[in-house]
UniProtKB/Swiss-Prot annotation:
Gene field: Odf2
Positions carrying Phosphoserine: S73, S74, S95, S106, S109, S115, S129, S139, S261, S632
Alphabetical list of Gene3D superfamilies matching this protein: 1.20.5.340
Cross-link (Glycyl lysine isopeptide (Lys-Gly) (interchain with G-Cter in SUMO2)), chain numbering: K138
Function as written in the Swiss-Prot or TrEMBL entry: Seems to be a major component of sperm tail outer dense fibers (ODF). ODFs are filamentous structures located on the outside of the axoneme in the midpiece and principal piece of the mammalian sperm tail and may help to maintain the passive elastic structures and elastic recoil of the sperm tail. May have a modulating influence on sperm motility. Functions as a general scaffold protein that is specifically localized at the distal/subdistal appendages of mother centrioles. Component of the centrosome matrix required for the localization of PLK1 and NIN to the centrosomes.
Phenotype upon loss of function: Null mutations in F9 embryonic carcinoma cells eliminated distal/subdistal appendages and prevented primary cilium formation. Loss of ODF2 also disrupted two mother centriole-specific NIN dots, while leaving one dot on the proximal end of mother and daughter centrioles.
Name of this chain's protein: Outer dense fiber protein 2
A cellular-component GO term for this protein: cilium
Originating organism: Mus musculus (Mouse)
Post-translational changes noted in the entry: Tyrosine phosphorylated. Phosphorylated on Ser-95 by TSSK4.
Subcellular location: Cytoplasm, Cytoskeleton, Microtubule organizing center, Centrosome; Cell projection, Cilium; Cytoplasm, Cytoskeleton, Microtubule organizing center, Centrosome, Centriole; Cytoplasm, Cytoskeleton, Spindle pole
Region (Interaction with BBOF1): 537-701
Length: 830
C-alpha cells in the first residue's frame, strides 16, 4: 500500500515487532507540505517473500511534526517498497530535483548552528556598540556646541561691558582736557593782588592734586581695562572657560568698578571746585565792569559840559552825508562779495558732488564684490549639494550591495556597516563645515554693516563741521570788513576835522553871537557819541561771541579727532582679530587637510575670500588715513582762525586808542568852538550843494538796490539749482542702497533655501538609516525563526531514530532494513 500525506499533526501508536514506518524527507528533514506520512498494512493471506510485505489490514500512524513555514504545497512522490508475506513497508523518498545531497550524521550536528549563532551575536554586539558610540559622539558634539555658544555669549557680554567702560573713560578724559584748559586760563590771568594770588595758589594746588588723583585713577582704570582685554583675548584663543578664568574675570571687573567709582568721586570734587572758582571770577569781573561803567559815566558828564551845540549840528550833517556815501560803498562791496561767495559756493557744491559720485562708485564696487562673494557661496553650496547627492547615491548602492551580501553571506554585512559609518562621519564633517561657512558669512556681513554705519556717521559729522567752519569764516570776514570801514571813517573824520580846525578859528567870533542854538546841537552830538560807545560795546560783545564759537569748533574738532582715533583703534582691533581668525582658520585647515583632500576647490575659494577681506581692510585703512588728513586740515584752519581773531583783537585795541585820541581832540575842539560862528553862512551854502549831491546819491542808491535785487534773485535760483542737484544725488544713492539691500535679501533667501535643503537631506538620511535598521531586525528575526525550525527538525530526527529503533528491534528486520534502506549510513549503530 502507498503512503498518504496528511495535513494534521501525525500520531505514532505504540509499535511492536511487526510495526512498519515510512519516511519522506528533504535536505533538512522537511516535508514539502505538512508532516511526513507513514502507513503500515498487515495481511494473513500471503506469506513472507524475501524482504517485501503485503498486508491487507492497514493502519495509519501520525507523528508530531515541528512548525513549517507556509507558502509550500504538498506533493506525492514515488516510494520504495519492501514486501514480506505478512507485512509490507512503503517509503516515499523526495525527488532528486529537491534533494541535492544525501543526509548524513554530520549534517545533524549543531556545531555549524552554534558558530552561526556566535557570529550573529558578535554582529549584534558590534552593531549595538557602534550605535552607542555614534550616540555618544552626537551627545558630545551637542555638549561642545552648547559650551561654545555659552562661551560666545559670555565673551560678547564682556565685550559690551568693556565698550561701556571705554566710553566712560573717553568721557572722563575729555572732561580732564576741559579742566586742564580751564587751569591754563586761570594761570594766564595774573592781574590779581597778593592776597588773591595766595588764595589762587592754594586753589591751584588743590586742583592740581585732584587732577593728579584723577589721572592716577584713570591710568589704573585703563590698566584694568587692558588686563580685561588680555584675559578675553586668551579666552578667545582657548575657547573653553574654566572656573579660574571666570573668577579672574569677576575680580578684574570688581577692581575696575571700584577704580571707576573713585575716579568719578575725584571728578565730582574737581567739578565743584571749578564751579566755585568760576563763580568767584564772574563776580570779580562784574565788579570791574561796574567800576569801568561808572568811570565812563563820569567822563561822559564832563564831556557834556564841554561840547557845544553848533559844532554837533555841523558834525551831524557831515556825518550823515559820509554815512550815506559809506553805505553806498558797503552795498557795492556786499554785492561783489555775494558774487564771489556764490562762485565759491558753486565750486564747493561741485566738489561735493564729485566726492559723492566717487563714494557712489565705491559703493557700487563694494556691492559687486558682495554679489561675487554671494555667487561663490552659491557655487560652494551647489558643490556640497552635489557631493551629498553623490554620497546618497553611493549609500543607496552600498545598501543594495549590503542586501545582496546579507542574502549571500553574513561577512559582507560588517563591511557595509563600516562603510555606512564612514559615510555618516563624512556627512557630519560636511554639515559642520557648512555651518562654519554660514557663521563666518554672517559675521563678515555684520562687520561690513557696522563699518558702513560708522563711515556714514563720520561723513555726516565732517560735513556739519565744514559748514560750521565756513559760516565762522564768513562771519569773521564780515567783522573784519566792518572794522576796516569804521577805521577808514574815523581816519577820514580826523583829516576833515584837522582841515576844518583852521576854519573854526575864524568862525569862533561869529559863533559867539549864535551860542544858544549851538548848545542844542552840542547835546545832539553828545547823544551821537553815546551811540558810538554803544556800537563799540556791541562790537566787543560780537567779538566775544565769535571767540566762544571758535572755541566750540575747536572742541568739536578735538572730539572728531578722538572719534577718529577710536575708529583707528577699532580698525586695529579688527585687524588683530582678523589675523587671529586667519591663523586659527589656517591651523584648522592644515589639521583637516588629511581628511579634506577630496575638497581642494573649497579651500581655494576660502583663501580667495580671505584675500578679499584683507583688501577690504586695506581700503578701510586708506579711508581712515584720508579722514585723519581732513582732520589735520580742519585743525590748521581753526588755528588760522584763532590767529585772525588775535589780529582782530589788536585792531580793536588800536581803535580804542584812536577813540581816546579823538576824545582829546574833541576837548581841543571845544576850546576852538568860539571861532566857528563866522562860518555859518558858508556852511549853509555848502549844505545846499550837498543836498543836491544827496539827491543824486539817492537816485544812485535806488539803481543799486534794483541791481542788488536782481543779484539776490540770481542767487536764490542758483541755490535752488544746487539743492535740486543735491536731492537728485541723494535719491540716486538711496536707490542704489535699496538695490543693494534687495540683493542682500535675495542672498539671505538663498541661504535659507540651502539650509532647508540640507535639513531635508538629513531627514532622508535618517529615514534611510531607520529603514536599514528595520531590515537588519527583520533579518535577525528570520534567522531566529530558522534556528527554531532547525531545533524542531533536530528533535524530529531524534524522534524518528527512536521510532526506527522500536520498529526494527528484531534482528532479521534490522538486517534487511540495513541492507536495503538508503538511510543506512545515517542510522545509529545497534
Amino acid at each position: 500500500m502507498s503512503a498518504s500525506s496528511s495535513g494534521g499533526s501525525p500520531r505514532f501508536p505504540s509499535c511492536g515487532k511487526n510495526g512498519v514506518t515510512s519516511l519522506t524527507q528533504k535536505k533538512v528533514l522537511r516535508t514539502p507540505c505538512g508532516a511526513p506520512s507513514v502507513t503500515v498494512t498487515k495481511s494473513h493471506k500471503r506469506g513472507m517473500k524475501g524482504d517485501t510485505v503485503n498486508v491487507r489490514r492497514s493502519v495509519r500512524v501520525k507523528t508530531k511534526v515541528p512548525w513549517m513555514p507556509p507558502g509550500k504545497s504538498s506533493a506525492r512522490h514515488v516510494g520504495c517498497k519492501w514486501e514480506n508475506p505478512p507485512h509490507c513497508l512503503e517509503i516515499t523518498p523526495p525527488s532528486s530535483e529537491k534533494l541535492v545531497s544525501v543526509m548524513r550524521l554530520s549534517d545533524l550536528s549543531t556545531e555549524d548552528d552554534d558558530s552561526g549563532h556566535c557570529k550573529m551575536n558578535r554582529y549584534d554586539k558590534k552593531i549595538d556598540s557602534l550605535m552607542n558610540a555614534v550616540g555618544c559622539l552626537k551627545s558630545e558634539v551637542k555638549m561642545q556646541k552648547g559650551e561654545r555658544q555659552m562661551a560666545k555669549r559670555f565673551l560678547e557680554e564682556r565685550k559690551e561691558e568693556l565698550e561701556e567702560v571705554a566710553h566712560e573713560l573717553a568721557e572722563t578724559e575729555h572732561e580732564n582736557t576741559v579742566l586742564r584748559h580751564n587751569i591754563e586760563r586761570i594761570k594766564e590771568e595774573k592781574d590779581f593782588t597778593m592776597l588773591q594770588k595766595k588764595h589762587l595758589q592754594q586753589e591751584k594746588e588743590c586742583l592740581m592734586s585732584k587732577l593728579v588723583e584723577a589721572e592716577m585713577d584713570g591710568a589704573a582704570a585703563a590698566k584694568q581695562v587692558m588686563a580685561l582685554k588680555d584675559t578675553i583675548g586668551k579666552l578667545k584663543t582657548e575657547k573653553q572657560m574654566t572656573c579660574t578664568d571666570i573668577n579672574t574675570l569677576t575680580r578684574q571687573k570688581e577692581l575696575l568698578l571700584q577704580k571707576l567709582s573713585t575716579f568719578e568721586e575725584t571728578n565730582r570734587t574737581l567739578r565743584d571746585l571749578l564751579r566755585e572758582q568760576h563763580c568767584k571770577e564772574d563776580s570779580e569781573r562784574l565788579m570791574e565792569q561796574q567800576g569801568t561803567l561808572l568811570k565812563r559815566l563820569a567822563e561822559a558828564d564832563s564831556e557834556k559840559a564841554r561840547l557845544l551845540l553848533l559844532l554837533q549840528d555841523k558834525d551831524k550833517e557831515v556825518e550823515e552825508l559820509l554815512q550815506e556815501i559809506q553805505c553806498e560803498k558797503a552795498q557795492a562791496k556786499t554785492a561783489s562779495e555775494l558774487s564771489k561767495s556764490m562762485e565759491s559756493m558753486r565750486g564747493h557744491l561741485q566738489a561735493q558732488l564729485r566726492c559723492k559720485e566717487a563714494e557712489n562708485s565705491r559703493l557700487c564696487m563694494q556691492i559687486k564684490n558682495l554679489e561675487r562673494s554671494g555667487n561663490q557661496h552659491k557655487a560652494e553650496v551647489e558643490a556640497i549639494m552635489e557631493q551629498l547627492k553623490e554620497l546618497k547615491q553611493k549609500g543607496d548602492r552600498d545598501k543594495e550591495t549590503l542586501k545582496k551580501a546579507i542574502r549571500a553571506q553574513k561577512e559582507r554585512a560588517e563591511k557595509s556597516e563600516e562603510y555606512a559609518e564612514q559615510l555618516h562621519v563624512q556627512l557630519a564633517d560636511k554639515d559642520l563645515y557648512v555651518a562654519e561657512a554660514l557663521s563666518t558669512l554672517e559675521s563678515w556681513r555684520s562687520r561690513y554693516n557696522q563699518v558702513v554705519k560708522d563711515k556714514g556717521d563720520l561723513e555726516l559729522e565732517i560735513i556739519v563741521l565744514n559748514d560750521r567752519v565756513t559760516d565762522l569764516v564768513n562771519q569773521q570776514q564780515s567783522l573784519e570788513e566792518k572794522m576796516r570801514e569804521d577805521r577808514d571813517s574815523l581816519v577820514e573824520r580826523l583829516h576833515r576835522q584837522t582841515a576844518e580846525y583852521s576854519a573854526f578859528k575864524l568862525e569862533n567870533e561869529r559863533l559867539k553871537a549864535s551860542f544858544a542854538p549851538m548848545e542844542d546841537k552840542l547835546n545832539q552830538a553828545h547823544l551821537e557819541v553815546q551811540q558810538l560807545k554803544a556800537s563799540v560795546k556791541n562790537y566787543e560783545g560780537m567779538i566775544d561771541n565769535y571767540k566762544s564759537q571758535v572755541m566750540k569748533t575747536r572742541l568739536e574738532a578735538d572730539e572728531v579727532a578722538a572719534q577718529l582715533e577710536r575708529c583707528d583703534k577699532e580698525n586695529k582691533m579688527l585687524k588683530d582679530e582678523m589675523n587671529k581668525e586667519i591663523e586659527a582658520a589656517r591651523r584648522q585647515f592644515q589639521s583637516q587637510l588629511a581628511d579634506l583632500q577630496q575638497l581642494p576647490d573649497i579651500l581655494k575659494i576660502t583663501e580667495a575670500k580671505l584675500a578679499e577681506c584683507q583688501d577690504q581692510l586695506q581700503g578701510y585703512e586708506r579711508k581712515n588715513i584720508d579722514l585723519t588728513a581732513i582732520i589735520s586740515d580742519l585743525r590748521s584752519r581753526i588755528e588760522h582762525q584763532g590767529d585772525k581773531l588775535e589780529m582782530a583783537r589788536e585792531k580793536h585795541q588800536a581803535s580804542q586808542k584812536e577813540n581816546k585820541q579823538l576824545s582829546q581832540k574833541v576837548d581841543e575842539l571845544e576850546r576852538k568852538l568860539e571861532a566857528t560862528s563866522a562860518q555859518n553862512v558858508e556852511f549853509l551854502q555848502v549844505i545846499a550843494k550837498r543836498e543836491e549831491a544827496i539827491h543824486q546819491a539817492q537816485l544812485r542808491l535806488e539803481e543799486k538796490t534794483r541791481e542788488c535785487g536782481s543779484l539776490a534773485r540770481q542767487l536764490e535760483s542758483a541755490i535752488e539749482d544746487a539743492r535740486r542737484q543735491v536731492e537728485q544725488t541723494k535719491e540716486q544713492a538711496l536707490s542704489k542702497e535699496r538695490a543693494a539691500q534687495s540683493k542682500i535679501l535675495d542672498l539671505e533667501t538663498q541661504l535659507s533655501r540651502t539650509k532647508t535643503e540640507l535639513g531635508q537631506l538629513r531627514r532622508t538620511r535618517d529615514d534611510a538609516d531607520r529603514r536599514y535598521q528595520s531590515r537588519l531586525q527583520d533579518l535577525k528575526d528570520r534567522l531566529e525563526q530558522s534556528e527554531s525550525t532547525n531545533r524542531s527538525m533536530q528533535n524530529y530526527v531524534q524522534f524518528l531514530k527512536a521510532s526506527y529503533a522500536n520498529v526494527f528491534g528484531d534482528a532479521p528486520y534490522t538486517s534487511s532494513y540495513l541492507t536495503s534502506s538508503p538511510i543506512r549510513s545515517r542510522s545509529p549503530p545497534a
